[in-house]
Amino acid sequence: MDTSNSWFDASKVQSLNFDLQTNSYYSNARGSDPSSYAIEGEYKTLATDDLGNILNLNYGETNEVIMNEINDLNLPLGPLSDEKSVKVSTFSELIGNDWQSMNFDLENNSREVTLNATSLLNENRLNQDSGMTVYQKTMSDKPHDEKKISMADNLLSTINKSEINKGFDRNLGELLLQQQQELREQLRAQQEANKKLELELKQTQYKQQQLQATLENSDGPQFLSPKRKISPASENVEDVYANSLSPMISPPMSNTSFTGSPSRRNNRQKYCLQRKNSSGTVGPLCFQELNEGFNDSLISPKKIRSNPNENLSSKTKFITPFTPKSRVSSATSNSANITPNNLRLDFKINVEDQESEYSEKPLGLGIELLGKPGPSPTKSVSLKSASVDIMPTIPGSVNNTPSVNKVSLSSSYIDQYTPRGKQLHFSSISENALGINAATPHLKPPSQQARHREGVFNDLDPNVLTKNTDNEGDDNEENEPESRFVISETPSPVLKSQSKYEGRSPQFGTHIKEINTYTTNSPSKITRKLTTLPRGSIDKYVKEMPDKTFECLFPGCTKTFKRRYNIRSHIQTHLEDRPYSCDHPGCDKAFVRNHDLIRHKKSHQEKAYACPCGKKFNREDALVVHRSRMICSGGKKYENVVIKRSPRKRGRPRKDGTSSVSSSPIKENINKDHNGQLMFKLEDQLRRERSYDGNGTGIMVSPMKTNQR
């Protein structure tokens, strides 16, 4: 056996001079780590320690043990669960197969390490076999402990390399996992940002759609707001209103009565104001031609009676100024009747001077033309309904009803419960009668040229103003006052002490003689009543029939009405809409109409009307009915009162739905009176019971007082 490559001889240990550079076996087998045995003194120490006694093993046994240890040193196929490693369980999306592919073939590396170690051992084994021929005797005496140490050192160096590679692979896997986690977080943040951007985009698109719809709806006539700054006024009349800086001009909102009851007229004509101001633009306060598209938004002007030979080009033109609430005096009285919130004044400007007595020059407020000398044109002023956004004040119910400063009219001139006869409308009221302050610019006293009264009613006293009753209306829906006050031919002899509850308005008390009337028919549209329901909730149940009647579309109800106001009040009862509530302590009643609330409030007052039998009443008409029944010691016959005995209560609708016009004795007698005899008797009785004081003021005397005298 050749022992030239052997580095250890047990028999010559004491005289060993070992050179590491000339030992081929040492350089081949331990070339990777020669520093382990670089010190000569270390080998001398090992020789003196008799290593043969420490590792008493032969070569075959050593090889078998080392191979078993190498097989047991297989590297794990996944990351170790130490403190610095990343837990794979935190990433549920990574399964075993994926980790095997990402672990950079650690299993193959471990196998390569095992093969390398085996090849080294085999090479060492061959070298030793070749050296046995030279040093066979020496090697036979040499123990196998030193060979064991050499192979163990080679194995340790290989294991250290594999551990280094394993640590590098583990650190690389942790780095990749951290990068994946960061990428996922960035992806989530980007998705959230995308969602926010999509939401903002949808909101922007919705706003654009709303703006587009607003622009499409605003393609119609545009009216200038009173607060808008306009160029200075010029000399034209249209420029006075179109370019005025004063907030007292506003576009026409409604030309209807404040009761919502349209008064009919025949031969409706179309009017359109196309005159331009000095700036070349059409004035904003012009009326559009009446057609189906403007019936709900624009109101045509009043019909003006003109000469037959007058051309269409010389017809009067209209603009509608508006008296602001801040310039209207608050003429609040104890009126028991609803009045208009504001006064809408329709000014009629004539193109040509009208000098004829019958050329339609009604009394009204004058407007001074700027820069033009001469007499001011004639105008006509009428009481119009308030704007839609302002609700009327309930007299005595200020605490629970929205209110504004407004001109109120005493119910002494309105609520007289007068039987219907031939009636005259007036639309000309003096400035002081309306209670308008003199601070309004460019206003003159009313003209004295149009104090003209028509018809055969010149002998009637104009001091009595009544509400316009409708004998064609249903009894269960009481009629409200019309937009124009009415002078009746036959004032009522019953409610002559109404002023006890409602004092005369100071504005009208001294100027009542200035009221003049003229006969006219006015187109009108309905206004929206005071309601607690959303806008349009009542009108959707109203159906206008071809015969100018109105049908209720509420489910299960097929009633028809001749007045729009009545059907609107009727629908409010269906919808439980009662905006007028009683403010008396402890009373929670509410009503659809204001006059029902007023009548109810009288029940909380002291009963001021007493019968000789001892029974008291809140209302004078109730006392008259009681005495006319002749059921007590205070019974009395009245010529103009006919009592129809009915088991049903007054003011309640009949169950069969039949007409109840006969529920009012006065209406019944008037309807039966074809020759006018009853009307004459009523008027004659009223004149006989009226006395005058020294100032000529008419005092209404109760029938009971007349009887006592």
Swiss-Prot record:
Chief place where the protein resides: nucleus
Species, as recorded: Saccharomyces cerevisiae (strain ATCC 204508 / S288c) (Baker's yeast)
GO molecular function, a single term: RNA polymerase II transcription regulatory region sequence-specific DNA binding
Ranges annotated as C2H2-type zinc finger: 550-574, 580-604, 609-632
Protein name listed in UniProt: Transcriptional factor SWI5
Modifications made to the protein after synthesis: Cell cycle-dependent phosphorylation of three serine residues prevents SWI5 from entering the nucleus, and it accumulates in the cytoplasm. As a consequence of CDC28 kinase inactivation at the end of anaphase, the three serine residues are dephosphorylated and SWI5 enters the nucleus to activate transcription. It is then rapidly degraded. Threonine phosphorylation also seems to occur. Phosphorylated by PHO85.
Polar residues: bias regions: 245-264
Modified residues (Phosphoserine): 225, 278, 300, 376, 488, 492, 505, 522, 646, 664
Additional remark text: Present with 688 molecules/cell in log phase SD medium.
Localisation per UniProt entry: Nucleus; Cytoplasm
Modified residues (Phosphothreonine): 339
GO BP: any one term: G1/S transition of mitotic cell cycle
Record's compositionally biased regions (Acidic residues): 471-480
A Gene Ontology cellular-component term: nucleus
InterPro entries given in the database record: GLI_C2H2-zinc-finger, Znf_C2H2_sf, Znf_C2H2_type
Motif Nuclear localization signal, residue numbers: 635-659
Role of this protein: Determines the mother-cell-specific transcription of the HO endonuclease gene that is responsible for the initiation of mating-type switching in yeast. Recognizes a specific sequence in the promoter of the HO gene. Activates EGT2 transcription in a concentration-dependent manner. Synthesized during G2 and early mitosis.
Keywords linked to the UniProt accession: Activator, Cytoplasm, DNA-binding, Metal-binding, Nucleus, Phosphoprotein, Repeat, Transcription, Transcription regulation, Zinc, Zinc-finger
The organism's place on the tree of life at top rank: Eukaryota
Origin organism lineage: Eukaryota, Fungi, Dikarya, Ascomycota, Saccharomycotina
DNA-binding annotation, residue ranges on this chain: 647-659
